From Swiss-Prot:
Pfam families the record matches: Ribosomal_L9_C, Ribosomal_L9_N
Protein name: Large ribosomal subunit protein bL9
Family: Belongs to the bacterial ribosomal protein bL9 family.
Gene Ontology molecular function: any one: rRNA binding
Function (record text): Binds to the 23S rRNA.
Claim: rRNA-binding is one of the keywords in the record: yes
A GO term from the CC aspect: ribonucleoprotein complex
InterPro entries registered for this protein in UniProt: Ribosomal_bL9, Ribosomal_bL9/RNase_H1_N, Ribosomal_bL9_bac/chp, Ribosomal_bL9_C, Ribosomal_bL9_C_sf, Ribosomal_bL9_N, Ribosomal_bL9_N_sf
Entry keyword set: Ribonucleoprotein, Ribosomal protein, RNA-binding, rRNA-binding
One example of a Gene Ontology biological process annotation: translation
């Protein structure tokens, strides 16, 4: 029996997938638990419509990410963070992902999730650092972060 999976079923299929499964398994388990439905013409067209909508949404997200990358990688886009510095030249504290996200919001009005900023170690020295930001699975931008003395 051909079914359309409504949810991911381990070892059988993923959501939206059309697959041939044993009739008893389909009727007694998958359909009863609302994990799948019979693959009728209406169900197949619905799946195609959902796939098209998802593809369109994915394309929009990719376009947004590319536009944001253009803004972040402009020459004049430098995130400046001021920190107190000791006599030896080391900063008191460190700059982390949340600080960079907050500075982007306040200086350039760009709301960026701190989890997208790929800072491996906190920044503890004065100067300019290039910090990668993963905007989309296919788009990664590099933001210049300048740590200066307050």
């Amino acid at each position: 029996m051909k079914v359309v999976f409504l949810e991911d079923v381990k070892g059988q299929g993923k959501k939206g997938q059309i697959k041939e499964v044993p009739t008893g398994y389909a009727q007694n388990f998958l359909i009863k638990k609302n994990l799948a439905k019979v693959a009728t013409a209406a169900a197949l067209s619905e799946v195609k419509g959902q796939a098209k909508a998802k593809e369109k949404e994915e394309a929009e997200l990719l376009a947004e990410a590319k536009a944001l990358k253009e803004v972040l990688e402009k020459e004049d886009t430098v995130v400046e963070i001021k920190m107190k510095v000791g006599q030896t030249g080391h900063t008191f504290g460190a700059v982390d992902k949340a600080d960079i996200a907050k500075a982007l919001k306040s200086q350039f009005n760009l709301k960026l999730d701190k989890r997208k900023i790929q800072l491996i170690n906190k920044i503890q020295a004065l100067g300019t650092k290039d910090v990668p930001v993963k905007l989309h699975r296919d788009v990664t931008a590099v933001v210049k972060v300048k740590i200066s003395e307050a």
